[in-house]
Amino acid sequence: MKIISDIQELRDHLRGQNRASFVPTMGNLHEGHLSLMRLARQHGDPVVASIFVNRLQFGPNEDFDSYPRTMQADIEKLEKEGVYILFAPTERDLYPQPQEYRIDPPQQLGDILEGEFRPGFFKGVCTVVLKLFSCVQPKVAVFGKKDYQQLMIIRQMAKQFALPVEIIPGETIRAEDGLALSSRNGYLSVEERAEAPELQRVLQQVREQVLGLKHRDVSSLLEIEKKAIATLAGRRWEPDYIAIRQQGDLAPASNEQLQAGEPLVILTAAKLGKTRLIDNLEI
């Protein structure tokens, strides 16, 4: 596996080859990331992974400085997966000048849910992803469904900018107890780790309640959301949201759409101690 930090060197290595299958990451790799590498390979070699902890998507009180950086272990994992190139730029490599141009997602998608509680987050995500796409010029790019809203936004960005890349979703990988794998799970104490699967259990309960409705309507969904939030809060979680939304655009469904069988997804974010976890479940 070649490890490259310079953009021009990356382009030189990729020139004349098939267009890559690309998996962007922030490192601290776990089985969820590695499953995305395998999915990328199914869409063709060479597979290019990137590791870059993107300052632009962290807020002033978030964990940029403490975000786990495990480069040597990550390299070993990627080598075992047969990744062709690891693109691991420094900030100076990727942002040689201040990044004054930013990609601002539309408010109806970028300022809701995660965007409401992490202002500027998706602006930072879209900016770095577009820049990485420019560097790698991939045929396909793989993003995990655990970050459901991010996947939707990147897909829409690629479509609106007519980028020649297909966005492939990767299924969420979970621990045996149901907790979605995440680099931030390492922040959890032993007691918090034992409690953390409750987040997925609550989503499963919400799903069962929605499927059990004889007639779906807006008021019924709001009541289910309210009770689920209360359930988490009663277990010492600090929920930011539990929201039942349309899969297509993450907007709340109308009564007419619900009665027509609009596909739905449940999305949540909640803090357990100092660790903020996100998860989702399609209906």
From Swiss-Prot:
In terms of superkingdom, the source organism counts as Bacteria
Q: Name one GO molecular function term.
A: ATP binding
Looking at the UniProt record for this protein, which Gene Ontology cellular component terms does it annotate, in alphabetical order?
Answer: cytosol
Entry's localization field: Cytoplasm
Which Gene3D superfamilies does this chain map to? HUPs (3.40.50.620), Pantoate-beta-alanine ligase, C-terminal domain (3.30.1300.10)
GO biological processes: pantothenate biosynthetic process
Q: Where does (R)-pantoate bind?
A: 57, 150
Record has Cell cycle as a keyword: no
Binding residues for ATP: 26-33, 144-147, 173, 181-184
One Pfam assignment: Pantoate_ligase
Q: Which keywords annotate this record?
A: ATP-binding, Cytoplasm, Ligase, Nucleotide-binding, Pantothenate biosynthesis
* Function statement: Catalyzes the condensation of pantoate with beta-alanine in an ATP-dependent reaction via a pantoyl-adenylate intermediate.
Question: So what family is this one in?
Answer: Belongs to the pantothenate synthetase family.
Question: What quaternary arrangement does the UniProt entry report?
Answer: Homodimer.
Q: What's the name of the protein? A: Pantothenate synthetase
- Give the originating organism: Polynucleobacter asymbioticus (strain DSM 18221 / CIP 109841 / QLW-P1DMWA-1)
Q: Which gene encodes it?
A: panC
